[in-house]
C-alpha cells in the first residue's frame, strides 16, 4: 500500500513539470530536445525515470522541461535519454576526497623522517617496554588476586560536592521558593481551586486584588502572564485574549492584522498566477412589489403528452432552420487529403442505408424535438456571472463530472454533458482504455469534492464509443455513456440542447468552455469549482495552418482538420480548455439573459493549454445520426 501511495504522489508530482514555458509537440516515442546539450524522447510523465536525477541535481528545473502534449490520463513530457547523476556523484567524490585529505594531514609530516624499525610489532613492543610506568605487582594487574583479596579499597579522592546557595553566596529571591498551602492561604481540601499556571519560570503569579467566582474560570485572566504563543496554526489571524463580556467596551471594528494577512495571502496567490479581484459589495435589492408568478407556464406542463407531439403542423416554424439534413451516414470526409471546409459550404448528399430517415427535415429530428421539450418548461435558467470565471449554481445544469475508480477512491478526470435523462455525451479518448472505465457520473454539483445539496451520483452501465474512433488519431472523438437510472430533473440538473446546424453560427454569438480541469498553467492547480472561459472560433484554414506546424499532427491529423471538427482559442492566449476538461462541452450561448444555449462541440484535444495552437473540438452536428440512434432510437425520446 505504501508503494501504491508513493507512486500516486510521484505521478501527481510529475504533473507539475507541465509548467514549462517550452512546449514541444509530440506523442510517445517521438524524439525531442530537452536542451541544446540534452537529447530526449517523448514519454508519459510516469514512465520518465531519468528526469528525477536532473531535478535533484539542479541541472534542470520544472519550468525547463518541455511538454509534448497530453495523453489519455497524464501529460507527455520530453524525457532525457541520458541518465543524470554525474553532478551529484561528482559532488560526493569531491566531498569524500576533501575529508580523506584532512584525515591524512599528519601523514606527510612523518614521511620525511623514516624510522629505522619498519616492523610494527617490534616497534609497539619496544614502546611498551620503555613507556611502562606501572607496577605489575599491584593487585589490579592480577585478576585472580583482585577477586580473592579482602582488603577494602582505600579512598584516594574526595567526592564532588554540588554547590549550594550558601556556598555560592548568592541572594535568594522569594519568588524562587516553592509555594505552600500556608503561603498561598488556600484550604488543603479544595485543590481544584488552584489558579491556572500559578507557578512558572518567573515565579509565583501576582496575587489578585479581587477573587474570581468559580463559574468564570473557563478562561484565563489577562494579568496571569504573557500572551500565549501560537505555533503552527495555518491561515489564522492574531487574536486577542478572551475577556469578560462587557457591553460598554464591546468593539465591532475588525483588527487591522486581519486585513494585512488577507493582503499577504492575495499577494502570494497572485505570484502563483491566480487572478485575485478586490471584493465588491453588491447591494441586495429587495423586491417589494410582488413579481408576476409564472401562472400560465405551469399549465403547459399539465399535459404529459405535449412534449411528444413533435410531428404536428401547429409547431413554430422558426425555432430551427428549415434546411434538410443531407448527410445522415456520418461518412465524414473519406478523402485522405486535408480538408479546409468553408462554413457556408454543405457536403454532398450520400445514400442513406436507413430508408426511414432519408432527408429528414431539421424540425422532425429527435434531437430538435428533445430540445423543444427542454425549452418548453418556460423556466429561465440562472443568469451568469458575466465578468467572472466561476459559474453560478444552475447556469449549466447539464454539466457532468465523470468519476473513475482510482485505488479505491473516486477521481474526476473528464467532463460530459447530460443530453437526455439517461445519457451523457463525452469524448471517446476519456473512456477508450481499460484503466479509463467510468464508474459513475456526478450531476448538479459545482464543487465536485464537496457538492451542494441536490446533486446526484448515478452509475454508468454502458459506454458507446464511435465505431470509427482510433486512439492514434483525433477523428471521431465522441462517446455516449448510459446511466443506470434516469436523472431527476431539477433547477440544477437538466439536459442540454444540441446544435443541429452544420454551418458555423454567426460571429456575434458567444462560445464558452466549462469544466473542472487545470485552471493555472503555472502551478497546475486543478479547480474543484466549475469554471468557464470565453473563446472565439478559429477559421478552418487558420486552424489547419497552426496544426501543420506541429510534427505529431502528421500522424494524429493526417487529413487535417475536417468538417466534423471545430477549432476555438483565446486571442490573448490566457484562457483555454486544459487537462481535466476533456469531454466537456463547447457551449454556444444564444441569449445570456434567459440562459438559452446549445452544445456545439465536445472538448477533444490540443497542444498544451492556452498556446498559439487552437484547441480541437468534435462538431456535434456532424454526429446527430450516431447520437440519435443511441439516445432516441426509432424517434423515441
Swiss-Prot record:
Regions of compositional bias (Polar residues) in chain numbering: 234-244, 321-332
A GO term for molecular function: serine-type endopeptidase activity
Cross-referenced Pfam families: Trypsin
One of the GO biological process terms: melanin biosynthetic process
Compositionally biased region (Basic and acidic residues): 125-136, 306-320
Disruption phenotype: Viable and fertile with no obvious phenotype. Reduced adult survival after wounding of the thorax, especially when the injury completely penetrates the thorax (strong wound). Wounding coupled with septic infection (septic injury) does not further reduce survival. Survival after wounding is increased when flies ingest the oxidant paraquat. Impaired melanization at the wound site. In pupae, aseptic and septic-injury does not induce the cleavage of PPO1, and in adults and larvae PPO1 activity is abolished.
Positions of the Clip domain: 31-79
Keywords: Disulfide bond, Hydrolase, Immunity, Melanin biosynthesis, Protease, Secreted, Serine protease, Signal
Enzyme superclass (EC): hydrolase
InterPro entries: CLIP (IPR022700), Peptidase_S1_PA (IPR009003), Peptidase_S1_PA_chymotrypsin (IPR043504), Peptidase_S1A (IPR001314), Trypsin_dom (IPR001254), TRYPSIN_HIS (IPR018114), TRYPSIN_SER (IPR033116)
Stimuli inducing this protein: Up-regulated after wounding to the integument. Levels are higher with septic wounding, using either Gram-negative or Gram-positive bacteria.
Signal peptide: 1-26
Catalytic residues (positions): 429, 477, 582
Primary location class: secreted
GO cellular component, one term: extracellular space
Disulfide bonds: 32-78, 42-68, 48-79, 371-497, 414-430, 543-567, 578-609
Sequence segments annotated as region (Disordered): 95-137, 152-178, 216-260, 286-365
Keyword Signal attached: yes
UniProt remark on domains: The clip domain consists of 35-55 residues which are 'knitted' together usually by 3 conserved disulfide bonds forming a clip-like compact structure.
Protein name: Serine protease Hayan
Organism name: Drosophila melanogaster (Fruit fly)
Lineage: Eukaryota, Metazoa, Ecdysozoa, Arthropoda, Hexapoda
Amino acid at each position: 500500500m505504501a508503494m501504491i501511495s508513493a507512486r500516486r504522489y510521484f505521478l501527481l508530482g510529475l504533473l507539475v513539470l507541465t509548467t514549462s514555458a517550452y512546449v514541444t509537440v509530440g506523442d510517445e516515442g517521438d524524439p525531442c530536445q530537452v536542451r541544446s546539450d540534452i537529447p530526449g524522447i517523448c514519454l508519459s510523465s510516469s514512465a520518465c525515470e531519468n528526469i528525477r536525477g536532473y531535478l535533484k541535481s539542479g541541472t534542470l528545473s520544472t519550468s525547463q522541461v518541455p511538454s509534448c502534449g497530453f495523453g489519455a490520463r497524464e501529460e507527455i513530457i520530453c524525457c532525457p535519454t541520458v541518465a543524470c547523476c554525474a553532478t551529484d556523484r561528482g559532488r560526493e567524490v569531491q566531498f569524500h576526497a576533501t575529508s580523506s585529505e584532512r584525515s591524512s594531514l599528519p601523514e606527510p609530516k612523518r614521511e620525511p623522517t623514516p624510522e629505522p624499525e619498519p616492523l610494527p610489532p617490534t616497534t609497539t613492543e619496544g614502546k611498551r617496554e620503555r613507556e611502562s610506568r606501572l607496577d605489575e605487582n599491584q593487585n589490579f594487574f592480577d585478576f585472580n588476586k583482585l577477586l580473592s583479596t579482602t582488603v577494602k579499597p582505600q579512598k584516594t579522592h574526595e567526592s564532588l560536592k554540588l554547590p549550594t546557595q550558601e556556598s555560592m553566596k548568592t541572594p535568594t529571591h522569594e519568588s524562587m521558593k516553592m509555594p505552600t498551602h500556608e503561603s498561598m492561604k488556600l484550604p488543603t481540601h479544595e485543590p481544584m481551586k488552584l489558579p491556572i499556571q500559578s507557578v512558572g519560570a518567573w515565579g509565583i503569579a501576582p496575587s489578585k486584588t479581587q477573587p474570581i467566582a468559580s463559574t468564570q474560570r473557563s478562561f484565563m485572566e489577562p494579568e496571569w502572564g504573557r500572551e500565549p504563543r501560537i505555533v503552527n496554526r495555518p491561515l489564522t489571524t492574531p487574536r486577542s485574549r478572551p475577556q469578560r463580556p462587557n457591553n460598554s467596551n464591546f468593539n465591532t471594528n475588525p483588527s487591522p492584522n486581519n486585513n494585512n494577512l488577507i493582503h499577504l495571502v492575495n499577494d502570494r496567490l497572485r505570484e502563483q498566477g491566480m487572478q485575485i479581484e478586490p471584493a465588491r459589495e453588491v447591494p441586495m435589492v429587495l423586491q417589494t412589489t410582488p413579481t408576476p408568478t409564472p401562472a400560465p407556464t405551469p399549465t403547459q406542463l399539465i399535459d404529459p403528452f405535449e412534449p411528444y407531439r413533435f410531428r404536428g403542423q401547429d409547431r413554430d416554424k422558426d425555432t430551427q432552420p428549415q434546411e434538410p439534413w443531407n448527410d445522415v451516414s456520418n461518412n465524414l470526409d473519406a478523402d485522405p487529403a486535408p480538408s479546409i471546409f468553408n462554413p457556408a459550404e454543405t457536403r454532398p448528399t450520400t445514400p442513406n442505408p436507413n430508408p426511414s430517415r432519408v432527408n429528414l427535415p431539421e424540425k422532425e429530428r429527435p434531437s430538435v424535438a428533445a430540445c423543444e421539450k427542454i425549452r418548453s418548461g418556460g423556466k429561465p435558467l440562472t443568469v451568469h456571472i458575466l465578468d467572472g470565471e466561476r459559474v453560478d449554481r444552475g447556469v449549466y445544469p447539464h454539466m457532468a463530472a465523470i468519476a473513475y475508480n482510482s485505488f479505491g477512491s473516486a477521481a474526476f478526470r473528464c467532463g460530459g454533458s447530460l443530453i437526455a435523462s439517461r445519457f451523457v455525451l463525452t469524448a471517446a479518448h476519456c473512456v477508450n482504455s481499460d484503466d479509463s472505465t467510468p464508474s459513475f457520473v456526478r450531476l448538479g454539483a459545482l464543487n465536485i469534492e464537496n457538492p451542494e445539496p441536490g446533486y446526484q451520483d448515478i452509475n454508468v452501465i454502458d459506454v458507446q464509443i464511435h465505431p470509427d474512433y482510433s486512439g492514434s488519431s483525433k477523428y471521431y472523438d465522441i462517446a455516449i455513456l448510459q446511466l443506470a437510472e434516469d436523472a431527476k430533473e431539477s433547477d440544477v440538473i437538466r439536459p442540454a440542447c444540441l446544435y443541429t446546424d452544420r454551418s458555423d453560427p454567426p460571429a456575434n454569438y458567444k462560445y464558452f468552455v466549462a469544466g473542472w480541469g487545470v485552471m493555472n498553467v503555472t502551478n497546475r492547480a486543478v479547480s474543484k469549482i466549475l469554471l468557464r472561459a470565453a473563446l472565439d472560433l478559429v477559421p478552418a484554414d487558420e486552424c489547419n495552418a497552426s496544426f501543420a506546424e506541429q510534427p505529431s499532427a502528421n500522424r494524429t491529423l493526417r487529413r487535417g482538420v475536417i468538417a466534423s471538427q471545430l477549432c476555438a482559442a483565446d486571442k490573448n492566449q490566457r484562457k483555454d480548455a486544459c487537462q481535466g476538461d476533456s469531454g466537456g462541452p463547447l457551449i454556444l450561448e444564444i441569449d445570456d439573459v434567459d440562459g438559452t444555449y446549445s452544445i456545439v462541440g465536445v472538448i477533444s484535444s490540443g497542444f498544451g493549454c492556452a498556446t498559439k495552437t487552437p484547441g480541437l473540438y468534435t462538431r456535434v452536428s456532424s454526429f446527430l445520426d450516431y447520437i440519435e440512434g443511441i439516445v432516441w432510437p426509432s424517434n423515441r425520446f
